[in-house]
Amino acid sequence: MYINFPNINPIIFSIGSFKAHWYGFMYLISFMFAVWYGKKSVEKKNQIKINIENLLYIIFISSCIGGRIGYIIFYNFSYFSQNILCSLHIWEGGMSFHGGLIGAIIAMYYLSLKQNVKILKISDFIVPLVPFGLGAGRLGNFINSELFGRIAPNFPYAFLFPNTYKEDLKIVSKNPELQDILDKYGVLPRHPSQLYEFFLEGIFLFFIIYFFTRKKRNTGSISALFLISYGILRIISEFFREPDPQIGLLKNIITMGQILSIPMIIIGVLYVNLFIK
């Protein structure tokens, strides 16, 4: 009835103490693809006069740093404040998109000053490349069997993730009717929310931006579309994603991801109404 989580080793290979993880490999592939697509876009549209590799490298590094810091602050500050060295274990997962966005904005602001280019021109160029990283990150989450979805006992294509037992016990203690399912399968069936987000925030968002950018747009409109679209898609996907156990549902209603996405939508809508005519 349900789908067993595929037996995927999160480590691709190891040489001595060095271990290559799928999670990091996904981001590497997305970066390489973004460089290729970015060069192709510049050649076709002649958007900006900045070295593409340097631009993407700086923004990529800044977004990774921001993503890690954002995760620490927004999602698990109490743990990392007591385990500071664990903050460096990026290969184990634990990145915040919203933190990464802040890091990318800081990098773009720096580059805009250094290269004397409007920051919105840089962001309009970068935005179509972002879904590559988002999609890659979600596939990495799936391989790591992390950020799994909420329980879905009535969904025949729900996944049986191998590392949800502790959380499932807490759920069964409050919902004893699920005990039989837990006894039979060992874990509770859940939505593969990582795959939902891969399709929504990766593939679907890419095509939204792709078709929008086929025509010449006012400066900032592509960035505004991204803020609005991602914010909406993230809020939707969060309804299928298990809230982080250390936070849960804030006020028993809303997730941290949804809270952080609301300002994105507001800023995008305000920019469209105030500056794009």
From Swiss-Prot:
InterPro entries registered for this protein in UniProt: Lgt
Cell location: Cell inner membrane
Binding site for a 1,2-diacyl-sn-glycero-3-phospho-(1'-sn-glycerol): 138
Pathway participation: Protein modification; lipoprotein biosynthesis (diacylglyceryl transfer)
Record-annotated membrane-spanning stretches: 11-31, 55-75, 93-113, 117-137, 192-212, 220-240, 256-276
One GO BP annotation of this record: lipoprotein biosynthetic process
HAMAP family referenced in this protein's UniProt entry, alphabetically: Lgt
Name of the featured protein: Phosphatidylglycerol--prolipoprotein diacylglyceryl transferase
Phylogenetic lineage: Bacteria, Pseudomonadati, Pseudomonadota, Gammaproteobacteria, Enterobacterales
